[in-house]
Regions:
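Phosphate/diphosphate-binding loops
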Residues: 1-55
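Gly/Ser/Thr-rich helix-start
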Residues: 3-5, 97, 108, 224
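A contiguous, well-structured pocket-lining segment that forms one wall/lid of small-molecule binding clefts
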Residues: 49-217
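Glycine-rich phosphate-binding loops at beta-strand->alpha-helix junctions
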Residues: 217-224
Length: 224
């Protein structure tokens, strides 16, 4: 994660590169990263931003935040105000922060005491479901079924907001009382963590297949 050539925070990019340079041809959907350095440590802040992005109004966002028990009401109002007015908020396509936000939404980790803690906990939850359920590895061809769209600059956007909505729906369906008492149905949460990883992987595969079709490049290198 770091600042990209356009002054926004990058970290979930698909780059076409050679020894002479690179071109950004895809990314996860942008969201606002509000709260400065705290947003990198407190995943609930990213979760608030992701929820605000998929909501039709600030009231709807507040209702979801309250139902999920993400933070104190006062904190949520301050965070939403920053997002609405773009105060101390920068556009971001950081995959790491997306993972932190999903981890907070699912009630796995709302804050991190070290870099990557929330994302690691999300991964462990997904692995627990995979081991318990006997789910097989993802069939890469499934990626063709995922939807992507084009950004104004022509790059392909992975529709990560669909994954956010799915995570919110899982926790919302568990029930308000369970969230308030921190008694999440562990099986459902672990399955949701697995489905997030699977869904994102399928979207990445889709974008890579499209990139190969457009550019002829057949080599994919993963980093991060």
């Amino acid at each position: 994660t770091g600042y990209g050539t356009d002054g926004t925070i990058w970290g979930g990019e698909i780059l076409l590169a050679d020894f002479d340079g690179f071109r950004r041809i895809g990314s996860i959907e942008p969201f606002l990263q509000a709260g400065g350095d705290l947003s990198a440590k407190e995943g609930w802040r990213i979760a608030v931003s992701l929820i605000w992005q998929i909501s039709e109004s600030k009231d709807e966002a507040m209702q979801i935040i309250r139902k999920l028990g993400l933070c104190e009401e006062k904190e949520a109002k301050v965070q939403l105000a920053m997002l609405e007015r773009k105060i101390n908020a920068v556009e971001s396509t950081s995959a790491g922060r997306l993972f932190d936000g999903i981890s907070a939404i699912l009630g796995i980790r709302k804050k991190s005491s070290f870099e990557g803690e929330a994302s690691m906990a999300l991964e462990f939850a997904a692995e627990a479901y995979e081991k318990r359920s006997g789910e097989k590895k993802i069939n890469v061809l499934d990626g063709q079924k995922c939807l992507t769209e084009s950004a104004d600059d022509g790059r392909e956007l992975l529709q990560t907001s669909r994954l956010v909505r799915a995570a919110v729906e899982v926790v919302s369906n568990i029930g308000e009382n369970a969230v308030a008492e921190d008694t999440f149905d562990q099986d459902l949460i672990e399955k949701a963590a697995y489905e997030f990883h699977k869904g994102l992987a399928e979207q990445i595969v889709t974008a890579c297949i499209h990139a190969k079709e457009k550019t002829g490049c057949r080599t994919a290198a993963l980093s991060g």
